[in-house]
From Swiss-Prot:
Its main location: plastid. This is Uncharacterized 3.0 kDa protein in psbT-psbN intergenic region. The keyword Plastid applies. It comes from the Eukaryota. It comes from Anthoceros angustus (Hornwort).
Length: 27
């Protein structure tokens, strides 16, 4: 399913780059 692939990709982004950027922004 395409949606599953997107969810996995978004989750991976959140775990790597987006996650660190968001953490810095929230601090």
């Amino acid at each position: 399913m395409l949606f599953k692939k997107i969810s996995k990709f978004v989750g991976w982004l959140s775990g790597s780059s987006v996650g660190s950027i968001t953490s810095k922004t929230h601090e």
